């Protein structure tokens, strides 16, 4: 369940602007605020089934966008590769004892990778 919630949260972050305002709001309430379908429905004066339909439609749309684009999958893969490259750069820095051109290059690489991880 937690993996599904994390996956949906990432889809919302990446593609939420492609949804209607109501779909974004309902997904946020359901996945991020952890409100029940009944609570969401009551808030807007609709049925529980109505809230369920809006959320399900929005989730399907986000999943379909990801299936077509693979953006989230590629982003996750890139983050893993950046962590691996950072570990290698830090090991090179350690092995160079912080001295000379190799240490300088390794330190520059660590700084570049830190910047990439933050973006």
PLM features: what roles do these ranges have?
Residues 10-19:
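Short amphipathic alpha-helical boundary/capping segments
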Residues 21-32:
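Short amphipathic alpha helix immediately N-terminal
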Residues 26, 39-41, 51:
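Hydrophobic positions on the alpha-helical face of helix-turn-helix-like DNA-binding modules
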Residues 47-48:
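Helix-turn-helix DNA-binding motif, specifically the short coil turn and the N-cap/start of the second
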Residues 54-57:
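Residues within the DNA-recognition helix of helix-turn-helix
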Residues 59-66:
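C-terminal flanking helix
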Residues 69-96:
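Intrinsically disordered, low-complexity basic tails/linkers immediately adjacent to helix-turn-helix/homeobox/MYB/SANT
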